[in-house]
């Protein structure tokens, strides 16, 4: 399966809700959901059938994959690892997704969206514990310190992210220093700490068949 490179607003329209994939644009009347709140495609307006059973489980999985920009193989690996670990499988799945470096860069306000955060990680603008890490899926651990590299602090995308995040409350499991573009993981995220429009239990049911 190739990575999706088309317009991300179509993904929100397909799921019928805002997935906040384009940062600040999602909070304006320019958002595609505000203009065309129906599925993309020739017959998008006519899709009125109620989704149940497998279809509902599939939609929840697709939402999670699209929010975190993961492919099917990688997403299934997260599930397999969560299912083998002690604890609630769905919560452990979300925990792994939240601890991705690109997601944490987004949560810390280094970018206005996960997509932007993924780019700044890939381009080597983020370091973990003083070392450059350019792997978006890198799993950050409790105690790790994440920051924007000194030479990258003036990037327009980073400054936009800082301005956007300065008015937002920081996640309870992260310690954020907006002035120095840095942060620290102080604990693993609990499900109640993660504002995510996904029913992870339906994903577990889908994969456990």
Swiss-Prot record:
Species classification: Bacteria, Pseudomonadati, Acidobacteriota, Terriglobia, Terriglobales
Keyword rRNA-binding applies: yes
Parts forming coiled coils: none
Annotated keywords: Ribonucleoprotein, Ribosomal protein, RNA-binding, rRNA-binding
Gene3D superfamilies linked to this entry: Ribosomal Protein S4 Delta 41, Chain A, domain 1, RNA-binding S4 domain
Domain of life: Bacteria
Pfam families (alphabetical): Ribosomal_S4 (PF00163), S4 (PF01479)
One GO CC term, this protein: small ribosomal subunit
CDD domains according to UniProt: S4 (cd00165)
Molecular function terms from GO: rRNA binding; structural constituent of ribosome
Subunit architecture: Part of the 30S ribosomal subunit. Contacts protein S5. The interaction surface between S4 and S5 is involved in control of translational fidelity.
NCBIfam families: PRK05327.1, rpsD_bact
Known role: One of the primary rRNA binding proteins, it binds directly to 16S rRNA where it nucleates assembly of the body of the 30S subunit.
Species of origin: Acidobacterium capsulatum (strain ATCC 51196 / DSM 11244 / BCRC 80197 / JCM 7670 / NBRC 15755 / NCIMB 13165 / 161)
Residues in S4 RNA-binding domain copies: 99-161
Protein name (record): Small ribosomal subunit protein uS4
Keyword Cell inner membrane: no
InterPro entries for this protein: Ribosomal_uS4, Ribosomal_uS4_bac-type, Ribosomal_uS4_N, S4_RNA-bd, S4_RNA-bd_sf
PROSITE patterns associated with the record: S4
Transmembrane segments: none
UniProt family annotation: Belongs to the universal ribosomal protein uS4 family.
